[in-house]
């Protein structure tokens, strides 16, 4: 049985900027001068006009411009919108506009806002994830236990550093290498995700021993017209492990482009279908690894071999092994403040899920009936508890995962705005906001809002699933006080580009806000 997933467009490289650069850029943008402005009381009519527009697609509109998108499909779509002024120590946020703000919606990746807010507050910005190697001192031959704790940033480079540490201690041969998968308990892959998603790199399994984001990359190159696309593995060694059923084709320069890659569930077989134009750029594809534990050990053996360290038997255990064996090598992840950048700015699902499980693992001792829960379920309990402590209404959301990839998540715009408001009052507020994409500058918003008044002024988390689009975050209008907002659309037949463009128009409308004096009659 093969499960297919789709990639239609080549994603442009995303710009990673330092935290300080992003924060300063957000605060120090020049004031945008415009004569086209609106009062807070005009937000509702302006949004209604946007949703009723009916003309042809264009690029992101400037503030005050009407888009040209046919939006007749919005008649049956569900919109959830909540716009508030940013609260301060002395004043609560004022609601400027609400449309079904308390209703449940599928949030897509906006769910990451809840996960990362709870993690940052509970674990601290300095929290790191440690991968350890322990030596069994009770045996003469060298037996090592490799303890993974779900570091999503671990790559082959870090495995090389671990191997160097072992070599520096004089280890030349390992009789048994045990991969310890017991830190995260629960099913792999995620049972809350759709079968098509778990085959793609963005839906890679989350376990204790994560390496290279548990995905393998390849490039699909167009050849001469009529010839199949050439498959090039990012790691040539993978070509020896996989068989490819290539039914793709190179087409002329005017034909449509699409690529479908399916992975067989029972064997290392990829099926490639679709077409790319002759002379065009290659299409990058990431495929989820089906056996992440074995993949980790296999690649660690390669790193050990590079240090002339021989390995005998390799095993994987999912059973906790409480021993007093000494730690002889270790490597740590970057701090949580850095991990959040990849999670929110680049909308990395695996990072979000690993952070969720870290929350659960760290709090396991304090949770009642923790043994009956998976580590992910424990993490969700901690998120709920932490957000409640921060003032988020407990009934305003129901989470099934930490990333938003599950279609069982239910989140109201009010829950997102309450979270954004709460975290803005905490000492870690600057770190949290700096992890978000900046309009026209970085991450998933790098290509949106360019050359508009929102560029550099809007920091928000994006979210996209089929028929779903969301944007929630902060906005500094040039002539009005800072805002917190959440905009979600569900159940729309419109293409993603149309949904995003419409959301962008609503956000751009907010940049035109100004204070208006009330009539005294």
For each feature predicted by the language model, list its residue ranges.
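Polar, glycine-rich mid-to-C-terminal structural blocks
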Residues: 146-251
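Short, well-structured active-site flanking segments
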Residues: 121-136, 141, 312-315, 429-432
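Beta-lactamase-like hydrolase cores
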Residues: 29-91, 97-103, 165-170
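Active-site SXXK
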Residues: 93, 107-125, 177, 209, ...
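A small/polar active-site loop signature that marks catalytic segments
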Residues: 249-430
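C-terminal segment of classical bacterial N-terminal signal peptides
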Residues: 19-29
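Bacterial N-terminal signal peptides that target proteins for export
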Residues: 2-14
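Small-residue-rich helix-loop
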Residues: 96-98, 346, 356-521
